[in-house]
Amino acid sequence: EARVNGIEAGSFSETTTMKGKAKFQIGGTDGVTDEAVMAAYFWEVDLNTSFTGEDNLNVEIETGNTPDTDSFLAVTDFGKGSGDVLKVSDLNYTFPVGGWSITVGDSLDASKQFTGACSYGNTVDALSDCGTGNSIAVGGDQSISAGYDLDNGFSFGVGLSAEDGEKSKGMFTKEGEDIYALNAAYSADNYAFAIAYANVDVASYWGINASYSPDGFPTISGGYEFGDPDTGKDTTQFAVGLSSDLGPGEVTIGMGTNGAITDGDEELYAYDLSYTYKFNDGMSFTPFAFIVEGANGGDDTTGVGAEI
């Protein structure tokens, strides 16, 4: 076939699709040292190719300038920092085996095929996944994740991941840092719940989250996670949230612990409020505000901003 600049016509599958997103966030805080207004962006393109109609090869490419630490962007659940450099952030392949859907890949969460029940869209990063980010939404690197849907509301998942698979420590060795996780969930018309167990080499976590959407009332979501580290005291964390249609958009309010709290330590909480308005199918505008309590009687961090 004809070639243009070294690329052969037809070299891409006719079933390859591309979608992308660009996000911008601006805001500032009060009550901490850095009180200047800050802004950041995140861009991602997602390529999906099917060879059989039932499988999918996924390649994600992204860039952004979100710093690892500062008083505002470190609090919000926004994008990733890559120093304005394009990089492959995810490469995985999904295929069916019997009734199972199996995903294998690099930079892949062990929970990729897990089913969660939290429907609250948080602003503060610590409130993500209704506080179950170490169990129901456990991360990973070189991973295999499998899910099975019984078609009656129940689903199950299992995940294995090696954090050092590309290093000399190897995968699933005594020296490596590995993840083993299990998940079960049930979904009905107006409620859902999910549980998960994850062993992340240095600790074990149990998590549960749920949501309920009563007719004519806001959707209620909540989650709780218990951590049992190999050394040290146990940890707990939780988050709850409400979301509801309001005018042309959706309002969301939530609160929870500011990350995991070690038994006997000071309990610190975070609160957030946001409103999302969709201009069209591809663009939305979300103003938000949050409060994160300060440790040891220090000043709380209060922030306001917007994302588009």
Locate predicted features.
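Beta-barrel outer-membrane channel/assembly domains of diderm bacteria
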Residues: E1-K112, G116-G165, K174-D189, A196-I308
